[in-house]
């Protein structure tokens, strides 16, 4: 997934 509030890819396991 991609987090529009971040410049990184959002990790869903990071919670």
UniProtKB/Swiss-Prot annotation:
The keyword Cytoplasm applies. The keyword Cytoplasm applies. Induction: By water stress. It is found in: Cytoplasm. It comes from the Eukaryota. One of its GO terms (cellular component) is cytoplasm. Keywords: Cytoplasm, Stress response. Belongs to the small heat shock protein (HSP20) family. On the 2D-gel the determined pI of this protein (spot N144) is: 6.1, its MW is: 17 kDa. Forms oligomeric structures. This is Probable class I heat shock protein.
């Amino acid at each position: 997934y991609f987090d529009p509030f971040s410049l990184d890819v959002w990790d869903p396991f990071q919670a």
